[in-house]
């Protein structure tokens, strides 16, 4: 009944470096078509406990769904990046890059997150006689 969060977490040996709650605003089946990064202290604290308890490292996707009373409930813990991984990257924290740095034994930098909204949409691209084109409001058929 409540909001759903796909939270991007980056950790090292049980210590959380980053926690980026991603509010899934518009869904179609399981895909986010509108989402935004959004601070959420309750979810951030829950993620910190999960990371410590499970001694997690690297990228982890932790999903929550709020009850009607706005209490976040854990849905799943995924040992992978989520489907909207581009959103934290555009917001200032490139999590796949940080995973590479971790694997190379390099120091994980401190970065600042800027709250960002993502809108995903479909469009048609046509290929005809080796020409690629789109049909938009300015096109004539």
Give each language-model segment a name.
Residues 67, 98-141:
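Peripheral (often C-terminal) accessory segments that flank ATP-dependent C-N-forming ligase machineries
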Residues 1-55, 66, 78-101, 121-124:
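ATP-dependent carboxylate/phosphate-activation module, predominantly the ATP-grasp catalytic core
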Residues 53-58, 107:
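Surface-exposed helix-capping loop/turn segments at secondary-structure junctions
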Residues 74-76:
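Pre-DFG segment of protein kinase catalytic domains
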Residues 57-69:
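A short glycine-rich, hydrophobically flanked beta-strand micro-motif that places a catalytic Asp/Glu
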